[in-house]
């Protein structure tokens, strides 16, 4: 019987890198709301007392970057200088310029259906039937822990919590089936006055136990709650944050491969984002159709070229039909050209800020999580 452990981590919305992601996507959403055809590449840097927003934009829209930034930071919960970061007093620097015309000529076409990819690159999508949202369990529960931390912070159930937090969950597998949780790490920023014993009890009873299924916890499960003993200085005061630094947290927690491109701040013409969403959509529908228990899709592009340069499928020995058949089904049922996938998933609209914390996948409010192609895939696979 083959045994192994697998670990994934997540971070809260108050983590410095996630602050940056949320600001970048707030800017993107505000622009797309006015101009759905805008080209946006927005990068953010945060550090004690300051935010710098930069990048390239081609749009007819006007957005108040400073007010948008302050609103985003305020919603996250950095509202007092005691935290080392205050939405109302931090400096906001705007360094956004125009997108290069060299890129524009490669992307834009007279016929929008022939729109070229905004860059070269390779993207992966993944799905697994080990959870009801067809995501790997380690990243799913790592996200759930920090999401719960945010909820009990914001509703004052645990009023001594502050916005910055990280989680990590190690699952035990036998023959690729979950048999339990081996270890849980949760580190949360807190105010100076709370005792270590109150913090540990509060986190265990209010965050960990309500989130993790009891049948996967046992006397051997190890819990590490604020293992350094103190986490008062956090957020941008503790570390600088940058857009696009949490690409494994954003995707599959390391369970699947990653092409290297980040998501936040990028409009749908950037295949780093849109094709990764489409690849998840494809993989999820293949698993939902019962054509595989696990499925990883790779798609690649050349800048200025509409058709993908490659499509490949890996089912890790769980496929019910050959991978050659699956590739044929993908080509038949999914339009993976940049224009096609934007239309297929209705991506040219302001839906992105919500993706920028707690994972882009496994959340059914997003269109790439639909399983509306599963029935047709199964029928054409003749299963």
UniProtKB/Swiss-Prot annotation:
MF GO annotations: ATP binding; magnesium ion binding; methionine adenosyltransferase activity
Keywords: ATP-binding, Cytoplasm, Magnesium, Metal-binding, Nucleotide-binding, One-carbon metabolism, Potassium, Transferase
Binding site for L-methionine: 56, 99, 239, 270
EC category name: transferase
Pfam families noted in UniProt: S-AdoMet_synt_C, S-AdoMet_synt_M, S-AdoMet_synt_N
InterPro entries (alphabetical): ADOMET_SYNTHASE_CS (IPR022631), S-AdoMet_synt_C (IPR022630), S-AdoMet_synt_central (IPR022629), S-AdoMet_synt_N (IPR022628), S-AdoMet_synthetase (IPR002133), S-AdoMet_synthetase_sfam (IPR022636)
PROSITE patterns per UniProt: ADOMET_SYNTHASE_1, ADOMET_SYNTHASE_2
Cofactor note: Binds 2 divalent ions per subunit.
Binding-site residues, K(+): 43
Subcellular location: Cytoplasm
Pathway: Amino-acid biosynthesis; S-adenosyl-L-methionine biosynthesis; S-adenosyl-L-methionine from L-methionine: step 1/1
Keyword Ubl conjugation: no
Residues holding Mg(2+): 17
Stated family: Belongs to the AdoMet synthase family.
Functional note: Catalyzes the formation of S-adenosylmethionine (AdoMet) from methionine and ATP. The overall synthetic reaction is composed of two sequential steps, AdoMet formation and the subsequent tripolyphosphate hydrolysis which occurs prior to release of AdoMet from the enzyme.
Protein name per its UniProtKB record: S-adenosylmethionine synthase
Organism: Shewanella loihica (strain ATCC BAA-1088 / PV-4)
Gene name of this polypeptide: metK
């Amino acid at each position: 019987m083959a045994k192994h452990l697998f670990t994934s981590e997540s971070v809260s919305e108050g983590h410095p890198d996630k602050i940056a992601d949320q600001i970048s996507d707030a800017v993107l959403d505000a622009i797309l709301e006015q101009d759905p055809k805008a080209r946006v590449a927005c990068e953010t840097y945060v550090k004690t007392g300051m935010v710098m927003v930069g990048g390239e934009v081609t749009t007819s829209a006007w957005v108040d970057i400073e007010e948008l930034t302050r609103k985003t930071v305020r919603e996250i919960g950095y509202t007092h200088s005691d935290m080392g970061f205050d939405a109302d007093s931090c400096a906001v620097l705007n360094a956004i310029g125009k997108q290069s015309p060299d890129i524009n000529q490669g992307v834009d076409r007279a016929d929008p259906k022939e729109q070229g990819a905004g860059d070269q690159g390779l993207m992966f999508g993944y799905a697994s039937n080990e959870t009801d949202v067809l995501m790997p369990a380690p990243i799913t529960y790592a996200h759930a822990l920090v999401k719960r931390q945010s909820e009990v912070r914001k509703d004052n159930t645990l009023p001594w919590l502050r916005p910055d937090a990280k989680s990590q969950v190690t699952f035990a597998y036998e023959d690729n089936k979950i048999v339990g949780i081996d270890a849980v790490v949760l580190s949360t920023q807190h105010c100076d006055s709370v005792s270590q014993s109150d913090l540990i009890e509060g986190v265990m009873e209010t965050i960990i136990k309500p989130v993790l299924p009891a049948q996967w916890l046992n006397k051997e499960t190890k819990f590490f709650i604020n293992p350094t003993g103190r986490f008062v200085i956090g957020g941008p005061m503790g570390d600088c944050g940058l857009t696009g630094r949490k690409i494994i947290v954003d995707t599959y927690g390391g369970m699947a491969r990653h092409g290297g491109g980040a998501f936040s701040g990028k409009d749908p013409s950037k295949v780093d984002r849109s094709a990764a969403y489409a690849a998840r959509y494809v993989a999820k529908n293949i698993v939902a159709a019962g054509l595989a228990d696990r499925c990883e899709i790779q798609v690649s592009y050349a800048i200025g070229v509409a058709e993908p340069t490659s499509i490949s499928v890996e089912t890790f020995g769980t496929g019910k039909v050959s991978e050659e058949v699956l590739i044929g089904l993908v080509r038949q049922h999914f339009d993976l050209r940049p224009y096609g996938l934007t239309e297929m998933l209705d991506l040219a609209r302001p839906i992105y800020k919500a993706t920028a914390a707690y994972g882009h996948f496994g959340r059914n409010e997003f269109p790439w999580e639909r399983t509306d192609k599963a029935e047709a895939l199964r029928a054409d696979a003749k299963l």
